[in-house]
Amino acid sequence: MPRRCWQLFVCCSVREFPVSVASRLLLPLLFVLASARNSALLYSSALTLRSSAAPLAFSSAGCRFRGPLHRPWFPVRLTPPDQAYLSRNSASGTSPRSIRQFPVPSGLALPTSVPLCARTLPPLSRHFASVGTMAQPQGDSKSFTPGHLEDQVPTSCKQAIPVFGCGSTRVRLAALLDGGEASVEKFVNRETPVTVCGWSRSVRKQGGGSLCFVVLSDGSTSSNLQVVVEAGIGGEFPQLLKCGAGCSFRFTGDIVKSPAKGQAVELAVRDPSKGHRFEILGMTDAAKYPLAKKEHTREYLREIAHLRPRSYLIGAVMRVRSNLAMATHRFFQDRGFLYIHTPIVTASDCEGAGEMFQVSTLLPPPPPETRENEKKTDGAAPKDAAAAAAEPLIPLTKDKKGVDYSRDFFGRPAFLTVSGQLAVEPYCCSLSDVYTFGPTFRAENSHTSRHLAEFWMVEPEIAFATLEDNMVVAEAYVKFCVQWVLDNCRADIEWFQKNQEEGLIARLENILAEPFARVSYTEAIEVLKAEEPKAQFKEKVEWGMDMGSEHERYLTENVYKKPCIVYNYPKDIKAFYMKLNEDGKTVRAMDVLVPKIGELVGGSQREDDRDRLAAMIAAKDLDPKPYWWYMELREYGTIPHAGFGLGFERLVMLVTGIENIRDTIPYPRYPGHAEF
């Protein structure tokens, strides 16, 4: 495993932290830095205290812990506004030494903080990455050992996590095949048999039927395990020879080094006396199995969405998607954001576009024979079936000009949410930094490769923040997710590079290499106008237009050759809640544009003045009644705040190279398609 060296910085807001305090922060505090995903390998690093003044360094040392730590870390954070974050040290680590213990001065509060996020991140204004740390006990200088940590961990946190599925000995193929040489050696030298479960990619016999080779996948990795079953194992061996792709199995045998090319190990099932055995859990009719062929078109796989997770493509996509969801929560949780569950059913249209799915129970009545069996309610007799059938399908108002929603389930019009933003803003204005992450719905009759009717949105809301803060956090989040996938989904990303997009890894590393370009909307339009004769855009470029995908991609792929952030858009093409700039023509909005996709993130500083917000609602010809509570937020302790929304499926497209958004979600919903 490569060494990782980190610098620990204690940072403060320039606005809130006076320089004079820097001298008081020169405390010889000792922190333990957790560095690895699976084991805590701690290396010597440079500790630096940094404030708004010049950085000041003091001596440090490091130590090494062997083996995984089966317990959480108890980090500390200096009392606000002081926070800590990690950044990678360019210097290589030195040999581990003992950590010295220093007394902590009295009066310095060290409350527990959030867990470690061991990733390389820049300082994010007020939003720093949290650091996994532990303060030394007070006392004289002495060696610091893992025992000091163990003594401070509650007993309830030390319980082992049980293993599930196929008995306690089941091994997931990812642990066996993706763990490197050390993992392979561990399983090869194991004295007890190994149990694996999964589905066959292929089954073939050899040696006149004395051997059966099963290529097995369990979905935990893009790699397969070859299982070699000898006829002497007995049992269902004759039935095994009749199996094909798609059958499910449980195999128990020995992991041995494979003589075949392209695979390090295989599972040998050959000796019943050692506990070797196998079980056919589920058979498949090879003639009917939809995935019997090795290659299938993306369109065909969408028609069998219930089986397409078994394909290499969708299996890899879903593993990456799962890791991106994990990265999302890790990023915001480590920065102190609260996760808010916003409603799916709402009465408000966040975008003001009216493209919403309506939720209603005002459906046609059941057939007359059903109505005849109605039970009495509140002393009233059941209606005559003929009279009930003669009623309008949907109740109307007395003047017959509209639907009578007072008889609907919610007593008013209700819709599936198009965004969690409006619902999460009140929590930002009460609990500070928050985020929501969930499904959203748009009734857009769009058949492009970038749009879905049901998709997931990541929507943070940052308290006491400006548009600048918003852009910094959005860029850091995108980079964090890209780095997370490169670190944790390497095998799948390499599969995508081989089978989906050549040069994918280089493109992702380019996202991390430099700061995103920043350009105002007006400047972007001028650049596109200058490029228009060469680019031959389908839509003419002019100020006030809502840039299309061709313009967004041209900026990132041809002009800046990296992601860029466009800000200060015309107010007429943006939503009502965005804060108006001093020029009266533009709003404090921003979009993060990325190669191959175009818009990935859309955000803004929110309008915090009630009168201006009311004027924007009126200018957009929106009914102010559904937004009464949203405007009322501006009457009671209004604050500047900002936020953004990121389409999660587009993020999956970005890191996998998938070209159609319908292949990034388990069950795609788009016009004319809502099966499964």
Locate predicted features.
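N-terminal chloroplast transit peptides
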Residues: 1-109
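Class II aminoacyl-tRNA synthetase catalytic cores and aaRS-like
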Residues: 29-38, 79, 95-105, 116-676
